[in-house]
């Protein structure tokens, strides 16, 4: 996970714990997430590691007939996050331990991340709603044909001034052990990096779903659910496709770890329906991509494209006569989404863990810690059951510490015990899903 992602996720949690404020994943995309921008929700999104949205090149205003322009988004003022982050540098506030913020030109030595919110005022929305939808707009036609749902950015959290972020802290040096060198992990873990975030950069946002009514009427309701569709139901095949995509989405409320476990099990069952050859080939495909985040993301896009078109696909390592059903594609897409949430270093550690056949132990470790603390919203140190680690040799234990440590779960051999930080939950959920898939595939192989 990049430093930018770490900061935006911590910010979203700090300002809106367990809420609907979505952190931005990519710095280069921030201009496409301003108020009124249209975005797409990624296929097989899950609230456990964050509903993920994809930029488009259009705003709501682009797809409306000409008419009155809305007033500028309302500035609701600066947040107190600046002072909280200042305090955290001294060790007292709940933001990532691995990030500090350094002021740049125009900021004092002690300045940190200062943010403000901009939101679409109700009167501005009323003004825009006087304009009809451009029903023949090619973008709208394309989205309707693909059964996509469109969302409108209604509120953003953005930087007030330019800041430079530096990664620092003990996480840099924890895992720079000799046996990691062949994996290329030392450079990706034990290093410093900095990123400059410009003034006015969107860090997090809220969306509401666009609803099309008839040919040119539209609305942006305050309350939505996963069963709602942007476009009126059309032909049957399109309806089936949308149901498939939304079927595994989580509701707005987490009941705890059990809900995550049931969701992962549902998707795993679809993978289990593949033949042994199919599962072995899928494992081979994924093993070649782990540690190559860009290629893994390309696979995710290809799978999304397959769902868009509603046809069967095959992966490179699969025999040509082994086709994937839409249900299988959806399940694989779910797990690939989880794996892309992990850093390249973690992905390489997963490959090493498969070689050493310690995935079951790692899965049990992650499962046990989340089962105990899933709804806990405060940091704490807790005892770890010794039997969770007793079967691991020294090298295997260090590898496991690194794998979970990069998701923010700090395991300490003395005790043994572990440090729980609620900010780590989304990353641990993604790691749990990734471990579950790989364990199933290695077992079948």
UniProtKB/Swiss-Prot annotation:
<dbReference type="GO" id="GO:0042742">
    <property type="term" value="P:defense response to bacterium"/>
</dbReference>
<dbReference type="GO" id="GO:0022829">
    <property type="term" value="F:wide pore channel activity"/>
</dbReference>
<dbReference type="InterPro" id="IPR041263">
    <property type="entry name" value="Gasdermin_PUB"/>
</dbReference>
<dbReference type="GO" id="GO:0005886">
    <property type="term" value="C:plasma membrane"/>
</dbReference>
<feature type="transmembrane region" description="Beta stranded">
    <location>
        <begin position="99"/>
        <end position="120"/>
    </location>
</feature>
<feature type="region of interest" description="Triggers pyroptosis">
    <location>
        <begin position="1"/>
        <end position="251"/>
    </location>
</feature>
<keyword id="KW-0812">Transmembrane</keyword>
<dbReference type="GO" id="GO:0070273">
    <property type="term" value="F:phosphatidylinositol-4-phosphate binding"/>
</dbReference>
<feature type="binding site">
    <location>
        <begin position="9"/>
        <end position="13"/>
    </location>
    <ligand>
        <name>a cardiolipin</name>
    </ligand>
</feature>
<feature type="transmembrane region" description="Beta stranded">
    <location>
        <begin position="78"/>
        <end position="95"/>
    </location>
</feature>
<dbReference type="GO" id="GO:0001786">
    <property type="term" value="F:phosphatidylserine binding"/>
</dbReference>
<dbReference type="Pfam" id="PF17708">
    <property type="entry name" value="Gasdermin_C"/>
</dbReference>
<feature type="transmembrane region" description="Beta stranded">
    <location>
        <begin position="163"/>
        <end position="179"/>
    </location>
</feature>
<dbReference type="GO" id="GO:0070269">
    <property type="term" value="P:pyroptotic inflammatory response"/>
</dbReference>
<keyword id="KW-1003">Cell membrane</keyword>
<keyword id="KW-0963">Cytoplasm</keyword>
<keyword id="KW-0564">Palmitate</keyword>
<feature type="transmembrane region" description="Beta stranded">
    <location>
        <begin position="183"/>
        <end position="197"/>
    </location>
</feature>
<keyword id="KW-1134">Transmembrane beta strand</keyword>
<dbReference type="Pfam" id="PF04598">
    <property type="entry name" value="Gasdermin"/>
</dbReference>
<keyword id="KW-0472">Membrane</keyword>
<dbReference type="GO" id="GO:0005829">
    <property type="term" value="C:cytosol"/>
</dbReference>
<dbReference type="GO" id="GO:0012501">
    <property type="term" value="P:programmed cell death"/>
</dbReference>
<dbReference type="GO" id="GO:0016020">
    <property type="term" value="C:membrane"/>
</dbReference>
<keyword id="KW-1210">Necrosis</keyword>
<dbReference type="InterPro" id="IPR040460">
    <property type="entry name" value="Gasdermin_pore"/>
</dbReference>
<feature type="site" description="(Microbial infection) Cleavage; by S.pyogenes SpeB">
    <location>
        <begin position="244"/>
        <end position="245"/>
    </location>
</feature>
<comment type="similarity">
    <text>Belongs to the gasdermin family.</text>
</comment>
<dbReference type="GO" id="GO:0048471">
    <property type="term" value="C:perinuclear region of cytoplasm"/>
</dbReference>
<protein>
    <recommendedName>
        <fullName>Gasdermin-A</fullName>
    </recommendedName>
</protein>
<dbReference type="GO" id="GO:0005546">
    <property type="term" value="F:phosphatidylinositol-4,5-bisphosphate binding"/>
</dbReference>
<feature type="site" description="(Microbial infection) Cleavage; by S.pyogenes SpeB">
    <location>
        <begin position="245"/>
        <end position="246"/>
    </location>
</feature>
<keyword id="KW-0449">Lipoprotein</keyword>
<dbReference type="InterPro" id="IPR007677">
    <property type="entry name" value="Gasdermin"/>
</dbReference>
């Amino acid at each position: 996970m990049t430093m930018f992602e770490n900061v935006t996720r911590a910010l979203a949690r700090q300002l809106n714990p367990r809420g609907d404020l979505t952190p931005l994943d990519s710095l280069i995309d921030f201009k496409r997430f301003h108020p009124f921008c249209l975005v797409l929700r990624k296929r097989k999104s899950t609230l456990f590691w964050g509903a993920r949205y994809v930029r488009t090149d259009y705003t709501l205003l682009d797809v409306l007939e000409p008419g009155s322009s809305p007033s500028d988004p309302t500035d609701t003022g600066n947040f107190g996050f600046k002072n909280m982050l200042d305090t955290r540098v001294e060790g007292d506030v709940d933001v990532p331990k691995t990030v500090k913020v350094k002021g740049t030109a125009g900021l004092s030595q002690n300045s940190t991340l200062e943010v403000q919110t901009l939101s679409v005022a109700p009167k501005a929305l009323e003004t825009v709603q006087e304009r009809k939808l451009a029903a023949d707009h090619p973008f709208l036609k394309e989205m309707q044909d693909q059964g996509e749902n469109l969302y409108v950015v209604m509120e953003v959290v953005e930087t007030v001034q330019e800041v430079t972020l530096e990664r620092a802290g003990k996480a840099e040096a924890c895992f720079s052990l000799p046996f990691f060198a062949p994996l290329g992990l030392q450079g990706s873990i034990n290093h410093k990096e900095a990123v400059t975030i410009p003034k006015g950069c969107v860090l997090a946002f809220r969306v509401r779903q666009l609803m099309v009514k008839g040919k040119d009427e539209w609305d942006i309701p305050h309350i939505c659910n996963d069963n709602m569709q942007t476009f009126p139901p059309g032909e049957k095949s399109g309806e089936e496709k949308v149901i498939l995509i939304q079927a595994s989405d989580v509701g707005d409320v987490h009941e705890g770890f059990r809900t995550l476990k049931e969701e992962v099990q549902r998707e795993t069952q679809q993978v289990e329906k593949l033949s042994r050859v199919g599962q072995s080939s899928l494992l081979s495909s994924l093993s070649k991509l782990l540690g190559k985040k860009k290629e893994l993301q390309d696979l995710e896009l290809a799978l999304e494209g397959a769902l868009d078109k509603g046809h069967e696909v095959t992966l490179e390592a699969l025999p040509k006569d082994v086709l994937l059903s839409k249900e299988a594609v959806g399940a694989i897409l779910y797990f690939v989404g989880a794996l892309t949430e992990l850093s390249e270093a973690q992905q390489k550690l997963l490959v090493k863990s498969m070689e050493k056949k310690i995935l079951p132990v790692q899965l049990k470790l992650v499962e046990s810690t989340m089962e105990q603390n899933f709804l806990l919203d405060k940091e704490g140190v807790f005892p770890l059951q010794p039997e969770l680690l007793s079967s691991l040799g020294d090298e295997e234990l260090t590898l496991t510490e690194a794998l979970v440590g990069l998701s923010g779960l700090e395991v300490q051999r003395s005790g043994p015990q572990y440090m729980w930080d609620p900010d780590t939950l989304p990353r641990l959920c993604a790691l749990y899903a990734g471990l579950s898939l790989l364990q199933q595939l290695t077992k079948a192989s």
